């Protein structure tokens, strides 16, 4: 599903964010991406969804080489990917419903399809009763769940989560992780970046560890 072959990423000024990263995720797999702040986790996720481009190496997504995508091709890639950030990037002047509907509106979905799929996504994250609320009226955990609903409303093949529990307490973090597991059980490929080892150590999913741009590990853990 996702394959990196000797991928490096350097920024202006010479800072090397990733160096020779190679790994492969199978369709329907769930894995954790760990490492200290600045290790390259966010850069790796941005490379998968085309926000960044590699300096060297190849990236494959669903059998397609996305290393040198043309700008006009990037939207087709991103429609297959749900991206979740620590800062959920919600529009504070729009309702919860409107925030979740944005990807469908951009994709040109019909009004009936938007209503059906937004309601289903909000129901999945337990926020159907908050559809008319504004994000400012929600708790931090609820805001993050709105971000998750927006990420899955397009029924993506892949979910990428960048420190989605970074601002949440242990109980809320556990709830967010269970949501990702539910999506994974129905076939969604999930890659979650986190530095919260205590949260993920109770799971047996594969762990990919970045350190100063180099990838280590990649085997399952107990």
UniProtKB/Swiss-Prot annotation:
It is a peripheral membrane protein. The lineage of its organism: Bacteria, Pseudomonadati, Pseudomonadota, Gammaproteobacteria, Enterobacterales. The keyword Cell division applies. Homodimer. Forms a membrane-associated complex with FtsX. Interacts with FtsZ, independently of FtsX, FtsA or ZipA. This is Cell division ATP-binding protein FtsE. The gene is ftsE. Its main location: membrane. The keyword Cell division applies. Belongs to the ABC transporter superfamily. Disruption phenotype: Inactivation results in a filamented cellular morphology, but not in a temperature-sensitive phenotype. GO terms for biological process: cell division; division septum assembly; FtsZ-dependent cytokinesis; peptidoglycan turnover; positive regulation of cell division; response to antibiotic; transmembrane transport. It is found in: Cell inner membrane. Keywords: ATP-binding, Cell cycle, Cell division, Cell inner membrane, Cell membrane, Membrane, Nucleotide-binding. It comes from Escherichia coli (strain K12). ATP binds at residues 35-42. GO terms for cellular component: ATPase complex; cell division site; cytoplasm; division septum; divisome complex; extrinsic component of membrane; plasma membrane; plasma membrane protein complex. Residues 2-222 form the ABC transporter domain. Part of the ABC transporter FtsEX involved in cellular division. Important for assembly or stability of the septal ring. One of its GO terms (molecular function) is ATP hydrolysis activity. It comes from the Bacteria.
